[in-house]
């Protein structure tokens, strides 16, 4: 097989949200990519993908950049593939996957904790019924596009909602939970199906990624099992994999992460599909780094 080339383009979420191939990311985002280009080494792992180029994430801006650098367009994703990625990067896809889960358990939150609102009045009704809420734009990046609301919309909140509705046609409105742990299931999608790659355990602040915990899959599963029954976690994983297989195989090739939340209620509960990222994640980098370090230790001993 031809040697694969990995590209670390963390500005991907901003590019996919904008959608324009001529979009120029903010200097801070492009600067972060340049300063941390060595992280591309930790994107590498055995995979079943057919493409020679494997980026953090595919978007029109990256495709145009590569073509301008002389890459043959024939080895890059088609316009239809890029549109599929953008459509399924919207938060509505996570809600759709959640609603199709056949996993009924008292410690697994159902999909009705959030709605896809198409008007400010819908948003206000949800907040009135549920109190504190989280507002999310369908497409956003790096913690942007997320607002936390208590009891009612401020003028600033309402203005943000109107702008988001005008630009992206909807706003995701969620009940706000007390978060105990944040984790993710990592997968690889290829032409033969979807493989489970591993778990990720991470922390965020105000919706923006903060850090990952380096640990084995077994240790992370043990930590999660301290709150949620292990069999429930495994059933959820297989259900998520089944639904993603139906939705993605044949249309998307690459890695993806399904973010999950363990929340405090009468007893700990699992939000099984909080976000879906059709790209690589920092959790995958952490998984690769841990697994590679473990391999080196075994080789030395």
Protein language model regions, located:
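ATP-dependent carboxylate activation and anion-phosphoryl transfer catalytic cores
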Residues: 232-301
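Glycine-rich phosphate-binding loop of ATP-grasp-fold ATP-dependent ligases
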Residues: 112-114, 133-158, 182-184, 206-224
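Conserved N-proximal alpha/beta basic substrate-recognition cap immediately N-terminal to
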Residues: 10-17, 29-129
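Phosphate-binding site of ATP-dependent enzymes
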Residues: 156-211, 257, 261-273
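A conserved active-site cap/scaffold subdomain adjacent to cofactor or substrate pockets
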Residues: 198-251
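Extreme N-terminal starter segment of soluble prokaryotic enzymes
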Residues: 1-4
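Conserved ATP-binding module of the ATP-grasp superfamily
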Residues: 108-111, 133-135, 149-179, 243-246
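Extended active-site and interfacial segments that coordinate phosphate-rich ligands
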Residues: 31, 197-220, 279-281, 288-298
